[in-house]
């Protein structure tokens, strides 16, 4: 069942019903998902599995692949790990209507970009420089990014430390700029690389963005800040190639499961690329799809 949920993301199949049709019609699909015979489970069987498995078991797939990647030295071969911190919006699975309306009670209205708002969730993620997510937290879209820094920075250092590594730099965009965030990062023994907004009078760092979004300041910090795109690359891979934006589940637990499956696919690709001796394909999801 878990293999089928991964296969669903790789093949960009939008719903469980269409997944079942693909499994029924295509023998190769049943073989990949390890279903024997000529018949595949029905969509209600998958729905029952998802409900009974729970978020812990589904997220266990992500953590298992992530830990395997750490042991193989895929996530970051260096002892000092640089991480990038950011969040991305996911539209809630809901629609208006007196008779056919669907609601997601846990979702809230939040920013999708600078000017637009929608009902949804935000995935707050810490990613390595190899564009692989180390850990993540899912919250309603109206929760401030800075409020999730503490839980994210409590989990990531513990995980990295298990493999004899430490976090040396935390790179983030200017919405994370605050004295509390800087203090939390420095408490870990890491250096914050977060530009200050234009309205700050006494900045904590020699790094800022111009009106045209060009980064200025200390050349060393400018070079480090440009590494922030690693977390954006992981979001891009999830949304464009693994249907991370095609959220068809409701409730925070199932949204976490959806994100865990997408991130697990990224690790599956990275691990397979290294095992076949093609590490340059570690971030190429398209190279491993039909």
Which stretches of residues belong to each language-model region?
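Basic, amphipathic alpha-helical segments enriched in Lys/Arg and hydrophobic/aromatic residues
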Residues: 221-290
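Short, positively charged, Gly/Tyr-enriched micro-motifs
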Residues: 1-61
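Polybasic low-complexity intrinsically disordered regions
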Residues: 48, 52-187
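Helix-centered, glycine/charged polyanion-binding patches within enzymatic domains
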Residues: 169, 174-240
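Short acidic/histidine-centered micro-motifs embedded in hydrophobic/aromatic stretches
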Residues: 22, 64, 241
